[in-house]
């Protein structure tokens, strides 16, 4: 059963301005430690950062919490599998929080077009184990 849907759109030009103004400090505020190396190797860092921020914001909307403890920018990371499909990884107290809320599977879709980065998140309820 779907228990949450979240969508976020980010203006990539705004991210580009923030990167120009604050540099790596801005990226460090948005990215989890596991994402920072990929960011540094990215050929389009403004798009990379915009997609990551949109995904994290969309997750917080799907949960209905906003970005506040334990749903924080550093507690959420995004990586892609070998086919390019993005997926979340959760860190710190966030996995226990999600389990307590009975969140099971999560789905993430990222897209970008004409200066906008977009993310959509769908959360499913955990399925009870049969004995």
Task: Locate each region found by the language model.
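Core catalytic alpha/beta fold that binds nucleotide/phospho-ligands
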Residues: 1-131
